[in-house]
A protein has these predicted regions:
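Alpha-helical transmembrane segments of multi-pass membrane proteins predominantly involved
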Residues: 1-225
Length: 225
């Protein structure tokens, strides 16, 4: 029996459409490259980190164009928790372009000798990755992970100027507000899961439609949170 189990495990193959998540993979590769180069390169070559970040965000936009041009039907991945459809592609393209423009507009200030902080690129790219995850999330857990991944780097970016009192104050306030918001969102998700017993959005919708739970005060409270 043990041998048969081992054989079945060996035969099990997980098929993943890597092209569908190529933008996310490119952003991850850019994040790793940016933080590695910032650690390894001397100060006079730190501008390479900015070039890699700008180029990576631009390359991540290319698969979006091809996917949108050749779109036929939604691509559902990871047991239904991740979806690639036209709406998510439009939002992903928008987020990537905004990040790309942000890099272009801020690169001179970030690279100035007056106040250089190389983690700027790492944090902004990490926030972009979280935004991409949110746009394709199809269940509560994936959406919450994406929200946290997108918002947590912003706490640090708001306090980017460590020597500035206003920057530190803004970072602390943003952090406290973010923690409170995350707690309320997670509590709302837990109520919704407790009522329906489902994580996937479509399953939650079907459960609410097929029952009288959509009139429940708990469901209303979870929607508000």
């Amino acid at each position: 029996s043990n041998r048969s189990c081992r054989k079945s495990v060996r035969r099990l193959k997980i098929s993943i459409n890597y092209f569908a998540i190529s933008s996310e993979l490119i952003v991850i590769l850019t994040i790793v490259s940016a933080i590695s180069l910032d650690l390894l390169l001397p100060r006079k070559l730190k501008y390479i980190v900015a070039l890699v970040s700008i180029l990576g965000s631009l390359i991540a936009f290319v698969p979006i164009i091809f996917q949108y041009a050749n779109y036929s039907s939604p691509e559902i991945l990871f047991e239904g928790s991740y979806v690639i459809d036209k709406f998510s592609l439009i939002l992903k393209g928008l987020f990537i372009l905004v990040t790309y423009l942000t890099f272009l507009l801020s690169v001179n200030f970030v690279e100035s000798d007056e106040y250089y902080q190389g983690e700027y690129y790492f944090l902004l790219l990490s926030s972009l990755l979280g935004a991409l995850v949110v746009t394709s999330s199809r269940d509560l857990l994936t959406m919450f992970i994406g929200i946290e991944l997108a918002s947590t780097p912003m706490f640090l970016l708001s306090g980017w100027k460590k020597g500035d009192q206003k920057s530190n104050e803004g970072s602390i306030k943003f952090f406290l507000l973010g923690v409170l918001s995350a707690s309320l969102i997670l509590y709302g998700f837990s109520l919704l899961y407790g009522v329906t017993g489902k994580l996937v959005f479509s399953d939650i919708a079907n459960t609410l439609i097929q029952s009288d739970l959509n009139q429940s005060p708990v469901t209303l409270l979870s929607a508000i949170l």
